[in-house]
Amino acid sequence: LGTGEDAFRQIFGDTNFSFIAGGVKFVCLNTNAMEYDYSEPIPDFDYIERQLTERADEFNKTVFCMHARPLCDQFNMAKVFQMYVRQFPGLQFCTVAHEHRISASDVFDDGVMYYGSNCMKNRSYLVFTIKPDGYDYEVVEF
């Protein structure tokens, strides 16, 4: 149909966005490179770079959220992406969902964890608790 991005923007807004809650910056990114014809950068490194300094005095921890994880078929420039991600203060973890299964993986063997969530038809989701000295997560099945 070719209207996926238009529908997404109409319902949710920008495909890249961030917010800060409790001193944690959540950077939410479009990583579905195969959905585009290379007319725009996916992931958008200029956007990621701006997030490093934008409102920098308001956060000391960072979480990245995306659909496709680095090194999967949908993701471009994985190693460059990881270099950017590692620059952020107090990087906690990254969340992904493209594979529709629960997973926990240190994709680059550098200590940065990527947690995959299931699809709703499999009736589970992840809950993260970010603490002063780290974080916990649990799988909730319903």
Predicted regions, residues:
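A generic structural motif
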Residues: 95-98, 142
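Short, solvent-exposed loop/turn segments at secondary-structure junctions
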Residues: 72-74
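Sequence context surrounding c-type heme c attachment/ligation sites in exported
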Residues: 77
